[in-house]
From Swiss-Prot:
InterPro entries: CbiA/CobB_synth, Class_I_gatase-like, CobQ/CobB/MinD/ParA_Nub-bd_dom, GATase_3, P-loop_NTPase. Its EC number is 6.3.5.11, 6.3.5.12. Residues 246-437 form the GATase cobBQ-type domain. It comes from Methanobrevibacter smithii (strain ATCC 35061 / DSM 861 / OCM 144 / PS). The lineage of its organism: Archaea, Methanobacteriati, Methanobacteriota, Methanomada group, Methanobacteria. GO terms for biological process: cobalamin biosynthetic process; methanogenesis. This is Cobyrinate a,c-diamide synthase. The keyword Magnesium applies.
């Protein structure tokens, strides 16, 4: 069983509704959550609601067969997939094709779509929206509608009647407007669930509202109508290494932006993954390589700077030529400082948080130098989203950069991937589907030095 919850646009309530549905259905089913697009934050709510790690599905990173492979791997021993879309149903990397859109995932998985509409001040115009979304692409099965932010029950019933009589699409529920149930936001989007002490109580509240407002039995019936997937699959990672190595992964309230498949690709390449906290731990685990993902080090820079023992150990790990791969927030952590707070100091540059977006885009990178995760001449898709920047220009740049950024911005002069010994740090986030040798290459790099 599978179903996609898509919006007519951003800010229609997809995450609140999807998470509430996931929580409500988890009382009876083993629910596997998914999120369309390059999002680390919404999935934290899905995971908390279901107890199962939410996965990302993205047609910019993944070929069609890889979308199905990632989906089917995650669905083993699960009952139903609830897939939260991104932005509007048809929004992708440009205004014409489907790449990067929720619609592309619906096609790859042959999944029915429930369209979520912000119904504030709409009645018959909501029917026009549904007609337009149906007509734009007949391959998309818009099987139902959820009306969010209706004024009252009378408003809901009028809008439901209009949609069902004009479009022949059923409305399976409506949620009365209540701004108190919205999720707290910050500069990169929602505040991750791992940082909110009251996240679970909010999810319980959303679930109760969903149970009162949406016909969940009908939603499950629609999900059951999805046909069996018979189209071919394509592996999202390659297995290159069989020798056992250990990789330390930074994971806490500061660093938690990881795609689960990236971690699994390490495990598939004989890596034992050991998690550690740069914020709280007093020593590194006994490992052969480090992976430091993104997050919010700019909000914890002072606390990170006070853990001087761990800062020194990571610097020493680097000096011993053992591999370290860092993305975005991890890149900032390896710099000399964040704001004026001292960090690891692998690189002599300073990083700061600005008041405007520095980069928000899907990226295409070409590898120009061999490094611990990729080889010269390869190309890979990724994404970048940050308000921070590294204070580097042609007057102080001292490092080779591994990647030419063909689409996107990068860290410096349309380049990214600071290289120093066996350490690589980049603003570009990678997904193993776009770099199938990621786990194997990092494992081999760790094996050659310390494994």
């Amino acid at each position: 069983m599978r179903i996609i919850l898509a919006g007519t646009g951003s800010a229609v309530g997809k995450t609140t509704i999807a998470t509430g549905i996931m929580k409500a259905l988890s009382e009876e089913y083993n629910v596997q959550p998914f999120k369309v697009g390059p999002d680390y934050i919404d999935p934290t709510y899905h995971t908390l609601a279901t107890g199962n790690t939410s996965r990302n599905l993205d047609s910019f990173f993944m070929k069609e067969g890889q979308v199905r492979d990632a989906f089917l791997k995650a669905m083993e021993k699960k009952d139903i997939a609830i897939i939260e879309g991104v932005r509007g149903l048809y929004e992708g990397i440009d205004s014409i094709n489907d790449i990067g859109s929720t619609a592309s995932i619906a096609k790859s998985l042959n999944a029915p779509v429930i369209l979520i509409i912000n119904s504030r001040s709409l009645v018959k115009s909501a029917a026009a929206l549904v007609l337009g979304f149906k007509a734009l692409d007949p391959e998309i099965n818009i099987a139902g509608v959820i009306l969010n932010k209706v004024k009252n029950n009378a408003h809901y019933l009028k809008t439901k009647k209009s949609i069902e009589e004009i479009t022949d699409v059923e409305v399976i529920g409506g949620i009365i407007r209540d701004d108190s149930i919205s999720i707290e936001q910050r500069h990169l989007g929602l505040v991750p669930a791992v940082e909110r002490e009251n996240s679970l109580s909010f999810i319980e509240l959303w679930s109760n509202i969903i149970k009162e407002s949406i016909d969940l039995d009908r939603l499950v019936e629609i999900a059951k109508e999805a046909p069996k997937l018979t189209s071919p699959r394509e592996d999202i990672w390659n297995k290159l290494n069989k020798q056992k190595v250990k990789i330390g992964v930074a994971y806490d309230e500061v660093f938690n932006f990881y795609y689960k498949e990236n971690i699994e690709s390490l495990e598939a390449n004989s890596c034992k993954v050991e998690y550690f906290s740069p914020l709280k731990d007093e020593s590194l685990p006994d490992v052969d390589g480090l992976y430091i993902g993104g997050g919010y080090p700019e909000l914890f820079s002072k606390e990170l700077s006070q853990n001087t023992v761990l800062l020194k150990q990571i610097k020493q790990f680097h000096m011993e030529n053992r591999p370290i791969f860092a993305e975005c927030g991890g890149l900032m952590y390896l710099m000399n400082s964040i704001h004026e707070d001292k960090q690891v100091g692998v690189y002599p540059y300073n990083s700061i948080l600005t008041d405007k977006v520095q980069a928000l885009k899907y990226t295409i990178a070409e590898v120009k130098k061999d490094n611990i995760i990729s080889k010269k001449g390869e190309k890979f898709n990724g994404h970048e989203f940050h308000y921070s920047k590294v204070l580097v220009d042609n007057s102080n740049i001292k490092h080779d950069l591994a990647f030419n950024i063909l689409r996107g911005k990068g860290s410096y002069n349309n380049q990214d991937g600071f290289m120093e010994k066996n350490t690589l740090a980049s603003y570009v986030h990678t997904h193993v589907a776009a770099m199938p040798n990621f786990g194997g290459n990092l494992a081999i790099s760790a094996r050659e030095v310390g494994g």
